[in-house]
């Protein structure tokens, strides 16, 4: 099974700021997510502490010794939503800064699904 992946404008903006080789490294991580879905485990993916959403995850990509992170979640439609990404090199507060942004983006995504009537009877996590 191939898992459907969507992304936010915030993720796209970050993606467009990357050089081609960084994009290729991120793309390799995203392809693993597409293939394995929620069963993608450490070291490629892990949970995110400090998120309001219990299912918030991160793709863990290394590029040239730098930890590039993509925060994502599976929505009630079982699609992976790439929310936001960044380089956490030397930033001990990266999760404190980015997890709330990812939470807000996921909340916006869920609200869009609600407006479209796609959440009727679906569990929100």
Specify the residue positions occupied by each region the protein language model found.
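Basic, Lys/Arg-enriched alpha-helical interface segments
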Residues: 1-67, 76-80, 87-125
